[in-house]
């Protein structure tokens, strides 16, 4: 369905229930080859064995784990995460991160492995 998503209006409960770390995610597009969601909050370090991911940072600055490095990110950055790559473990400087996440193929419910 053609649509315009006003990402600036997507806050709090509009993104769904928060998990135990305060992370929220709402999928807006689910197609044959990908899903598109808006994510808000901090996530523990994890990986997806079968899903590639791209995150476009909308709000928040700080660091995230990408592979074996902790890297700084800011609004406007695009993070490319090939399947099997450890990522997350966000450390914001102030406001939690808000990002658009594109996953291909669409992520299965059991395709997240938490890491130390």
Task: Give, region by region, the residue ranges found by the protein language model.
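Short, conserved beta-strand element in jelly-roll/cupin
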Residues: 38-39, 47-66, 102
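A structure-centric signal for secondary-structure junctions around beta-strands
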Residues: 33, 51, 96-97
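Short strand-coil-strand connectors
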Residues: 31-32, 65-69
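Short acidic-glycine-tyrosine-enriched beta hairpin
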Residues: 69-84
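Ligand-binding loop in jelly-roll beta-barrel domains
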Residues: 83-109
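Structural motif
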Residues: 61-63, 70, 86, 96
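Short histidine-centered beta-strand/loop micro-motifs
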Residues: 27, 44-49, 90-92
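A short, N-terminal "cap"/entry segment at the start of jelly-roll beta-barrel domains
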Residues: 1-38, 45, 114-116
């Amino acid at each position: 369905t053609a649509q315009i998503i006003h990402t600036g209006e997507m806050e709090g409960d509009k993104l769904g229930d928060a998990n135990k770390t305060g992370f929220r995610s709402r999928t807006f597009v689910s197609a044959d080859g990908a899903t598109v969601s808006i994510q808000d909050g901090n996530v523990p370090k994890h990986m997806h064995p079968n899903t590639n991911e791209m995150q476009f940072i909308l709000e928040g600055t700080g660091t995230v784990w990408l592979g074996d490095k902790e890297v700084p990110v800011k609004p406007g950055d695009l993070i490319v995460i090939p399947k099997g790559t450890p990522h997350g473990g966000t450390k914001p400087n102030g406001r939690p991160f808000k990002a658009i996440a594109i996953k291909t193929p669409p992520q299965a419910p059991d395709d997240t492995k938490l890491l130390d």
